[in-house]
Swiss-Prot record:
Organism: Arabidopsis thaliana (Mouse-ear cress)
Phenotype when the gene is knocked out: No effect on the levels of ICN metabolites.
PANTHER family listed in its UniProt record: OS08G0158400 PROTEIN
E.C. designation(s): 1.1.1.-, 1.-.-.-
GO terms under cellular component: extracellular region; plant-type cell wall
Location(s), subcellular: Secreted, Cell wall
Glycosylated residues, chain numbering: N52, N257, N341, N439
Domain (FAD-binding PCMH-type): residue spans on this chain: 69-247
Post-translational modification: The FAD cofactor is bound via a bicovalent 6-S-cysteinyl, 8alpha-N1-histidyl FAD linkage.
Chain's role: Probable flavin-dependent oxidoreductase.
Lineage: Eukaryota, Viridiplantae, Streptophyta, Embryophyta, Tracheophyta
Protein name: Berberine bridge enzyme-like 7
Amino acid sequence: MKEALSILCLALLVSVSEAEVTKPNSENFIECLRYRTSSENPITDSISIADNTTTFLSSYLSYTKNKRYSSPNFKKLLAIVAAKHVSHVQATVVCAKTNGIQLRIRSGGHDLEGLSYRSSVPFVILDMFNLRSITVNVLSKKAWVQAGATLGELYVKINEASQTLAFPAGVCPTVGVGGHISGGGYGNLMRKFGITVDHVSDAQLIDVNGKLLNRASMGEDLFWAIRGGGGASFGVILSWKINLVKVPKILTVFKVNKTLEQGGTDVLYKWQLVATKFPEDLFMRAWPQIINGAERGDRTIAVVFYAQFLGPADKLLAIMNQRLPELGLRREDCHEMSWFNTTLFWADYPAGTPKSVLLDRPTNPGFFKSKSDYVKKPIPKEGLEKLWKTMFKFNNIVWMQFNPYGGVMDQIPSTATAFPHRKGNMFKVQYSTTWLAANATEISLSMMKELYKVAEPYVSSNPREAFFNYRDIDIGSNPSDETNVDEAKIYGYKYFLGNLKRLMQVKAKYDPENFFKNEQSIPPVRVIE
């Protein structure tokens, strides 16, 4: 395709006010739901009308993870539909569209900016948590998992079927499968096997017309888009068919801390030089965080090194002694265990914790903010020290995670799926802060922006890349009721790089009126050569 492209926008500014739809009416919406569902699968009990009652607030808060958005906007939120059947999802899509009501789709509630459960225009929430069935086929090494299941539930089901099968996904067990996979979720198996979207072979999706589609009926372009491009811009993900991977019976993990006083900065600098060049069986995360110092009232930074190796401890020790002796890894630091038990380790549960804990769905929201970056070359020691200096300014919990690339991630083309961040990245950074009281929100958000600014010289640029699953409204957004294409390109190129153009084309083909939208959704644009 030539560099000079003429871009025909289906709508340079697509807004609710411009669409020829009826004025939002909750009563009409509810009646539509009842009309479009059968008595065999009644929807009435799945509907919670928005009101200031304990019952409704409990429904809203049960999957609201960020307390910054724990107070629903009753002037805009009309209802929550906790779908229990596919027909409930279909009816919700059709009835919301017919009545001019915006739809927000919530799986596990871990959307970091709360875009799956808030809007500034009249909307309904489609909760997916009841749709959580999982079927594992050991012979084919495949599984079907519904969007409302959590990673913890998926890992338990896999473990019940096999001791040597796994799925390369994240380490937080309460994350919902629907959004995690569609945004390109990653975990400690990524250097060996890639990320979630590299292991999806089929999907079920409800489109803008309420039709149930699979890979064959949706077509390869839409199937490509929902693997890494975020499913909520294109439809409602019902389920994923995933390919499981073979892992050894014995894996080894360790957790070693190095404070600044123990040479943590030097070890982290060396980590940057070797982490992407380790054998692909080894994943080693670096996690700088503020901790209490040796003296009362003192604070320091500890770089916590978490690692997982697909093999026994002796082989891991040999690698570490050769590649990163500065860490000083000892045999007693290493713990051999099954893949399933590593999921408990990474979730920070103590040894011996029953696996049933991964089935829990705790409702303990907190105040937090996260941002992300991709790093292409080592951050110099003076750069690390500037980051430490900024972290010390925080009065609340703050940390960064450095997640190494390399291995298989260097071998998968950036266009294989909609997830583009592949070869050329040394590691991905997540910045996070949490706080206890609402009155600390403003200063906490301001400090995160300062930390992000300090990191700017040391990370990717033009664009400054970002990870879609670490949603960050600061990098660009649209109002709830419109999608300005120029604004969408700002955040879109950061999340999707060169894949954005194809994503916009797919959006224009399957959702030309832009029904499935939020503040950071894909706009419908046809690109004509």
